[in-house]
Amino acid sequence: MDVYRIKKNAEFRAVYKRGKSFSNNLLVLYVYMNRKNVNRLGVSVSKKVGKSVVRNRIKRLIKESFRLNSDYMKVENGYDLVFIARKASNGKSYVEINNSVKNLIKKAGLYK
């Protein structure tokens, strides 16, 4: 499955405005149907979470978790997904972030 990145501020704002949100203690997920044949992934980590090293690590963990699980979880195509890290995600392991990502995708009902 192809996964592209959401990079532009306007694209993030569109997902926030029109999308539906799901949350747990570590992450928030916004989902918006983009009417394309691909999924697009955006990751946002606020400065409240920590310094740049911490924020970039969390971004990498979320992206890797989604990449490894997207085929396994059989996520449907045609969605914009934006993950927002909460302050509690600071210092969490890959396993905890991975479980959080899986949980949110299940909540959103994005299985084929």
UniProtKB/Swiss-Prot annotation:
E.C. number: 3.1.26.5
This protein's record includes keyword tRNA processing: yes
Q: Name one GO molecular function term.
A: tRNA binding
Listed GO CC annotations: ribonuclease P complex
Gene3D superfamilies in the record: 3.30.230.10
Q: Which SUPFAM superfamilies match?
A: Ribosomal protein S5 domain 2-like
Record InterPro entries: Ribosomal_Su5_D2-typ_SF, Ribsml_uS5_D2-typ_fold_subgr, RNase_P
Catalyzed chemical reaction(s): Endonucleolytic cleavage of RNA, removing 5'-extranucleotides from tRNA precursor
Q: Which family does it belong to?
A: Belongs to the RnpA family.
Q: What is its quaternary makeup?
A: Consists of a catalytic RNA component (M1 or rnpB) and a protein subunit.
Q: What is this protein called?
A: Ribonuclease P protein component
